[in-house]
Amino acid sequence: MALTIRKFNKGRDPERLAMKYAKMRTSPFVFLRGTFHLFHQRLPVERVLERAPKAWVCGDLHLENFGSYKSDNRFAYFNMNDFDEAALASCTWDVVRLLISVRLGMRELKLEASGIASLCREFVDSYTRELATGKARRIEQEGKWCAWLSAH
């Protein structure tokens, strides 16, 4: 595995790379963040995930690739914010990677295993429910919120 990681990072600034490797050794969550390529190399082996349709995916979705930004319409949005690894791939890949990051991140925060499992189930249930509606949600179009924002 170390050889694969070194090969992937070949040609990068040695000083910054040393810092990256040192940081990756600090926790499984940070290791996950720094090795998206390992995730993608191993995922195609899991054929069950390939049955899902292809879609544009973030490619490196994890807890720290979300953030807020202010749009031209003056609204602040919270969404994915890192698309360096975006790809046309199985629509399940981002879900799997995000769930792995939730498990690792919550372990670092010392959440009990039952709490982590519950959080992951809630994510999958909510995600499935939202997909079933067949539409994107935009908070500024959600009635009361829009009226409140317009008044302020």
Write out the residue ranges for each language-model feature.
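Catalytic activation segment of kinase domains across protein kinase-like and atypical kinase folds
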Residues: 51-58, 62-107, 126
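An alpha-helical support segment within catalytic cores of ATP-dependent transferases
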Residues: 21-54
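Low-complexity, highly charged intrinsically disordered N-terminal segments
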Residues: 1-26, 30-33
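Short, surface-exposed helix-loop/turn micro-motifs enriched in polar/charged residues
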Residues: 31, 50-53, 58, 72, ...
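Internal, well-ordered alpha/beta segment that forms a basic, Gly-enriched binding/recognition surface
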Residues: 87-152
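Active-site-adjacent bridging/hinge elements
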Residues: 6-15, 36, 68-77
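Charged/polar, solvent-exposed surface patches and flexible loops
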Residues: 3, 7, 34, 38-41, ...
